[in-house]
Amino acid sequence: RTLKEITSIKTGQAVNKQMISANPGEYPVINSGREPLGFIDEWNTDNDPIGITSRGAGVGSVTWQPGKYFRGNLNYSVTIKNPKLVSTRFLYHLLLELQPEIQALCTYDGIPALNASNLKDLLIPIPCPDNPQKSLEIQAEIARILDAFTELTAELTAELTARKKQYNYYRDQLLSFEEGDVEWKTLGDVCDFKNGFAFKSNLFKDTGLPIVRITNINGSGVDMADVKYFDPSDYKENTQSYAIDSGDILIAMSGATTGKIGCFNSNRTAYLNQRVGKFIPKSNALNNRYLYHFLLSKTDAIYVLAGGGAQPNLSSKALMEKILIPIPYANDSTKSTAEQKRIANILDKLDTLTNSITEGLPREIELRQKQYEHYRDQIG
């Protein structure tokens, strides 16, 4: 059946941020995004939770807002005409599955928009349409399964957030030292820094030796899913001096990932692109993993050092001169390296639990999300 056969589609009421600021209250305002635009002192919708964004960057997004709320003029209500034929929660999950089809109905000339007349012709599959009772039972079971996966994913995500906070707390505690037990040194005192090579984009290959670019630095590791390659014979320079090995600590020097740290964990050698830097401890007096965790704690300060703003750009000179690292028991090298190793080992365990794609919670969340999408695909 078409969406217009089973639902009524209407536009909400005009609203803006000034109106919300002037009339603060408890009712969420759902307008051009999945999250509330704000909270206001009046509502115009009750127990009509499904909506679809009609204009703006989030056009075509399916929204769910239970209870009383204010629906804005950039959100279509999708109200079921006969609840004895179609379950609200089933329809919500189905519309999520049909998101690509909804996006295809949108226009993107100027301000992105979704015309209600186009949306109304969207085809909606209803199980066992000739047996309403059986149909509702099937819909209810499908919605129950998908809701269970949604809830589990939310719980895992909350757990992951808590673990990250735990890691940050212990990291900050472990990197705090009593006066006299620590000597603060510049990164330049204890590290060398290697800038990347200007590989030419017109010489990128589909195979060959991998290049690590700033977009590969993800804030803890190096994501090699989207990698460009090169052939050394295309360059007269000695590209071997830009090699990266497993365990090397990298930093993005410009762009959207400026200041993000990544530890390269691959058995295959890769190569530094321009605006990617590599930290090289000057001696065994500095534990590499200790350095890694310290740098993670300084990403905000490093970003500020880069100037922030729309086009942050980090200077290696400023980085190595202005960021100070605490060296415990600096006058006793044996005691210092032992303490650095102890701290790094504790943080490595927490880091693995929090971030590892094979051992930690992100992998569990990914699996549950795939299960959810698999079951949701069955209703499309």
Give, region by region, the residue ranges found by the protein language model.
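Non-catalytic DNA-recognition/assembly elements of restriction-modification systems
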Residues: R1-Q13, M19-I30, S176-G196, E364
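Amphipathic alpha-helical coiled-coil/heptad-repeat segments
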Residues: R1-T2, P127-T186, P328-G380
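Short, structured motif recognition centered on aromatic/hydrophobic residues
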Residues: L3-T7, Y27, N75, T88, ...
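Short, basic/aromatic beta-hairpin or loop at an interaction surface
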Residues: N216-F230
